[in-house]
Curated annotation (Swiss-Prot):
Species in which this protein is naturally found: Caenorhabditis elegans
Name by which UniProt lists this protein: Orotate phosphoribosyltransferase
Gene3D superfamilies linked to this entry: 3.40.50.2020
Role of this protein: Phosphoribosyltransferase which catalyzes the formation of UMP from uracil in vitro and thus may be involved in UMP biosynthesis via the salvage pathway. May also participate in the first step of UMP synthesis by catalyzing the formation of orotidine 5'-phosphate, a UMP precursor, from orotate.
Tissue-specific expression: Expressed in body wall muscles, spermatheca and vulva muscles.
Amino acid sequence: MTAATATANGNHSIEDPVVMKVQAASPIQETDFFENLYQMECFRTGEFYLKSGQMTPIYIDLRRIMSSPRVLRMAAQAMCEKIVASNLKFDYVVGVPYAALPLATLVSDILNVPMLMKRKEAKAYGTKQLIEGVYQPGGTVLLVEDVVTSGESIRETAEAIRNENLLVTDAIAVLDRQQGATANLAEDNLNFLSFLTMEKILDGLITKNEMTEERKHEIIAHLAKPF
């Protein structure tokens, strides 16, 4: 039995005991989480190229946190707190392949909601499935991502999942780079939430004397440029 209970519209909400457990835990603070990311050297400045081909003056490497079970769980717990506070309703958790799979696994475990896995492409052997796991057609999926730029990876994943007769209405990420994802995803009827924003990261780097206010505004202006 999972932590999902049926509602009138066919979606599901997290069971009360799980909600209470999440709410009772000490909230993950943005500053504490930033400090852990900083210590793990997740922030790099310079010239880096994203999947989109766009150059960025700052790169956030959240893949590094999979090497720290404690920090990885902090990230998942922070997402779960956001999920519960936002009263999101869903039947399954899916990590955007493949960097978000560790996060999705922990979110599934903390909330006691089934996880599915979406392959980048269907297997050419065996069952040839694109979606791995046990699910009912018409169920609702929550997408989990680590870092979001324009939201394109989420859009691609949502489209593929919808083509498998599943619904996708919400997506959540650890970090929003604030490069248009919220508006882009809204065009596909996707509600987007995040725990951290790029501006919060830049503010944290200022407190570490790694950046000036002037440089922060230069980076924000650069990130605001259209792709």
